[in-house]
Amino acid sequence: MDRLEFLVEEPSIAEVLKVILPKILPQGWILNENFFVRPHQGKSDLKKSIPRKFQAFSELPFNTGIIVVQDQDANDCRRLKQELSELCNQSNTKPCPFRVRIVCHELESWYFGDPKAIETVFPHLFKVSKYKNKDLCKHPDSIITPKNRLKRIVGEYPQIDTAKKIAVQMDVNANKSESFNQFKNGITSLIQS
C-alpha cells in the first residue's frame, strides 16, 4: 500500500485521526504526503462524495487504500456498515481496497475507551478513579449518547479543540473501545493487503 485516504463524516473525527494515526500507522506514513484525512460536513455529504472520491483515487498512480469512517449514532451498526460497503463497492471501478469502519454511537466512545486521556484534559472535572469500574469506561461502546454523557460530566466544551486535546493524550494500545480497536485492525489489514 502506497497511500491511504480516510474519508470521515465530520471535522472533529478528522482532527482526532490527524493526531492518532501517526501513533497507529507504521513508521514512514506522513500526514498529507502518503496518508490523507478528508473531512465532510455530515453523513449525507460523506455519502454523496464516495462515488466521486473512489473514482478519483482509482485513477491515482499509487496503490491507494480507502477507509470510510462514520458515527453510528442511532443507526443499526451492521446495517449502516453494509449500506456504506455497498455504496463503496458500486463506486469502486478500479478497484481500490477499502474498509468501512463505524464509530460505535459517537466519537466520544473512543474518548471513554481511554479515560486517562479525558482526565488529563479535564483534571478537575473527570477522575478515572470515580468511573473506572463503571460501564462508562469498561464498555464505552455501550454508551448510547457518549457526547451527552461527557457534557454532563465536564460541561459544555469546544468540540474540535477538545477532540485534538484528548487525541494527543490517547494511548492507542490501551483503548477499551471495541469500535476503536476494529478501526485500528482495519488499518492494519488494509496496509497488509
Question: Model-found features: residue ranges?
Answer:
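Helix N-cap/beta->alpha junction signal
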Residues: 9-10
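C-terminal accessory helical subdomains adjacent to catalytic cores in phosphodiester-
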Residues: 1-4, 14-40, 47-65, 69-193
